[in-house]
Amino acid sequence: MLVLSELKGLTSGQRNAFVASFLGWTLDAFDFFLMSFTLGAIAKDFQVEVTEVAFAITLTLACRPVGAFIFGRLADRFGRRPVLMVDILLFAVLEIASAFAPNLTIFLVLRGLFGIAMGGEWGIGSSLTFESIPERARGAVSGILQEGYACGFLLASVVNWALFEVIGWRGMFIVGVVPALLVIYIRMFVEESPVWQKGEHAKAKLNFFAAMRGHWKLAAYVIVLMTAFNFFSHGTQDLYPQFLRTTHHFDNGTVSLLTIVGNVGAIVGGVMFGAWSERLGRRKAIIFASLLALPVLPLWAFAQTPILLGLGAFLMQISVQGAWGIIPTHLNELSPDAVRGTFPGLMYQLGNLFAAVNATFQVWLATRYDDNYAIPLALVTGVVAIVIVILAAVGVEKKGVVFGSTESA
């Protein structure tokens, strides 16, 4: 009820900014997670090992900070709205180009470029949203906005279930051009950030490093926090379909269904903990959500039946995406005004860079245990859940800060 009341209180302009950012992140994640469902098919087509194709995930994640910096600085200088449109169009074009890659080398190059484009969307979209909405709505909106990622994974699961056997992996990537249509919606209905319009962009003419003076300690903390968070999400999601196929030998329909169940849990967790963070505070909500992963871990990784695995997936993603649902508002509140188009996205994506080895590491470790993916998935998830609890406990927050004020400078 709290979430609905906050959404109803938004003006049409505020809702449009939120919807555009949510859909942008949803479709961004949709394009990214098509890889998770097609690793085996791509490897077979290119006649290489799955570990070689899995490097495309690592490469995409590693390139995202480049996009976060480039598009973030452009958004700080020229506005959130136009740069968001260019960025969405670019990652849609690169997704469809991936469908026509003639070999693994070209495919990897295109996935790296896709990572640059993907890296720009989250930071720009979140800054546009949180600079547009009232302070009281930040927690509720944050939980929904971040779960655009889970919705994208869910959408990829449905497309995999419905179309993969018919159109193959190349056809799946062609479907990934759909995000380009969102540009039309943004062009027609979305307004520029009021904070940016009030003149905050003038500060962005400063060199980024000059604007960050006095904030480097904060930046270092956030990068470490986001590294742990990215291990948390990618460690439970990227190779989960491969875990179901290889370790449990489930068919495509069962894999899709269990992935869908997990993503429903992710949406529930993100919305629930995002809203609760308005009452509990950002750090306490992150701690509670992360701790939930520990008792769920044995069920999620080591259950043997589809029903129990589905229950484990649902509960695990409530935990993982419950913690993640707080991140958009948390990072935007911590960000200095002059670099809000850059700071949240860059910190997030630098965390992605340092966590980019996750997929390659988990595949490598699974091969050491006769392709038993349960062990690497459980190991990564358990360790990083504890690390996140510690980092949140010793960290800072600025819940309720007024953007454009001296406190937010």
Regions found by a protein language model. Give the residues of each.
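Cytoplasmic helix-loop-helix junction between adjacent transmembrane helices
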Residues: 110-147
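Cytosolic juxtamembrane N-terminal segment immediately preceding the first transmembrane helix
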Residues: 1-30
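Extracellular/periplasmic helix-loop-helix junction of adjacent transmembrane segments
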Residues: 36-66, 253
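Conserved MFS/SLC helix-loop-helix module at the cytosolic interface between two early adjacent transmembrane helices
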Residues: 66-102, 280
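Helix-breaking motifs and short loop linkers at transmembrane-helix boundaries and internal kinks
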Residues: 47, 79, 100-106, 134, ...
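C-terminal transmembrane helical hairpin of 12-TM major facilitator-type secondary transporters
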Residues: 277-327
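Helix-loop-helix hairpin linking two adjacent transmembrane segments in secondary transporters
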Residues: 145-187
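Extracytoplasmic gate region of multi-pass secondary transporters
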Residues: 35-36, 216-267, 355-359
